[in-house]
Amino acid sequence: VTIGPVCELPKEVGGPCRGHIIPRY
């Protein structure tokens, strides 16, 4: 499940998006 716009890195790993989480495992 992708929340918000597609980001290169999720916030959990210091991504450029605020409050956006993308599953990259």
From Swiss-Prot:
Major localisation: secreted
Disulfide partners: none
Top-level taxonomic group: Eukaryota
Protein name: Kunitz-type serine protease inhibitor 2
Keyword Secreted: yes
UniProt domain BPTI/Kunitz inhibitor: residue ranges: 6-25
Keywords per UniProt: Protease inhibitor, Secreted, Serine protease inhibitor
Positions bearing the site annotation: Reactive bond: 17-18
GO terms of molecular function: serine-type endopeptidase inhibitor activity
GO cellular component: extracellular region
Summary of the function given for this chain in its UniProt record: Inhibits bovine trypsin, human plasma kallikrein and human neutrophil elastase.
Subcellular location: Secreted
